[in-house]
């Protein structure tokens, strides 16, 4: 009987350990470690926060996933996902046909317009004709770079690429470029900063191009990782339904970022 009890207890312990391990599935969430307020920003202690961090963690909690933020440069996010350095990308990455050749995406979790900001002392709009002769800064390997090359290269003086959007913003403020294209919310945050207020203003939203800009931002997952994709999709629906999505969003925005406008990176 004693031997039987020991065996039973041992078996139960193994089963419990397996259950706990299963319930604490760790998922590495890839993001580019650059300031992209209000989506991602770093405090004085080095901790990352922002709307997208909060939404990512809410999705993970709803899906019962133990998520860990894993920094990788923007250019390395898709390669890192494919080589299993990370398990998903939640970094304002737009769902596009070109990216879907390499990775899969969850349903969208936000969608805002693409805009052009420029120097205050220059009057122009966000059209090819308006940007004629201008130097336009964009972040490399983003939908903004692809869009600018497709729609503005024939009229602009130069499409200048940067590793981060912040670098493009800094050059715009310094007068080294005439304009930059990015997500409207991110540009709005820059224009509300002391530096942005002093130098620049919004020139308008670019014309829609669903092929390049995509239908919105989703979580990137590896091709064939249907299980994680379905968990994330269910979690997005869950936090939209239970009010958590709106609760987080109201801390950062006074409008709906889930909307139907075209855009992000």
Task: Identify the residue ranges that each predicted region occupies.
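Bilobed "Venus flytrap"/periplasmic-binding protein-like clamshell domains
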Residues: 29, 33-36, 48-61, 115-165, ...
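Extracytoplasmic small-molecule ligand-binding "clamshell" domains
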Residues: 25-93, 101, 242, 251, ...
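Periplasmic-binding protein-like
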Residues: 33-34, 111-118, 195-233, 255-265
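Ligand-binding clefts/hinges and TM-proximal coupling segments of bilobed small-molecule sensing domains
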Residues: 66, 143-160, 201-203, 233-265
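A ligand-binding cleft/hinge motif common to bilobed small-molecule-binding domains
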Residues: 76-79, 93-101, 149-150, 178-213
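Extended ligand-binding regions for polar small-molecule ligands
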Residues: 53-62, 122, 130, 135, ...
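Acidic, polar ligand-binding/catalytic clefts
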Residues: 57, 66-130, 206-212
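Alpha-to-beta junction loops
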Residues: 64-66, 82-91, 134-135, 173-186, ...
């Amino acid at each position: 009987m004693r031997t039987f009890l020991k065996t039973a207890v041992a078996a139960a312990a193994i089963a419990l350990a397996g259950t706990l391990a299963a319930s604490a599935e760790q998922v590495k969430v890839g993001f580019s470690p650059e300031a992209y307020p209000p989506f991602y920003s770093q405090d004085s202690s080095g901790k990352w926060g922002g709307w997208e961090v909060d939404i990512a963690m809410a999705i993970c909690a709803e899906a019962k996933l133990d998520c860990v933020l894993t920094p990788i440069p923007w250019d390395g996010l898709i390669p890192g996902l494919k080589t299993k350095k990370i398990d998903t990308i939640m970094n304002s990455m737009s769902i596009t046909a070109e990216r879907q050749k390499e990775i899969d995406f969850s349903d969208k979790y936000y969608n805002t317009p693409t805009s052009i900001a420029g120097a205050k002392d220059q009057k122009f709009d966000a059209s090819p004709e308006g940007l004629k002769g201008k130097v336009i800064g964009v972040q490399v390997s983003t939908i903004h770079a692809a869009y600018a090359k497709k729609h503005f290269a024939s009229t602009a003086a130069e499409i200048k690429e940067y590793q981060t959007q912040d670098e493009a913003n800094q050059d715009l403020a310094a007068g080294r470029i005439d304009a930059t294209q990015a997500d409207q919310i991110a540009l709005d945050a820059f224009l509300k900063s002391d530096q942005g207020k002093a130098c620049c203003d919004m020139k308008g939203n670019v014309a829609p191009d669903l092929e390049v800009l995509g239908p919105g931002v989703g979580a990137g997952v590896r091709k064939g990782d249907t299980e994680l994709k379905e968990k994330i999709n269910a979690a997005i629906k869950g936090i939209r339904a239970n009010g958590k999505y709106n609760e987080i969003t109201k801390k950062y925005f006074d409008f709906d970022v889930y909307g139907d406008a075209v855009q992000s990176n």
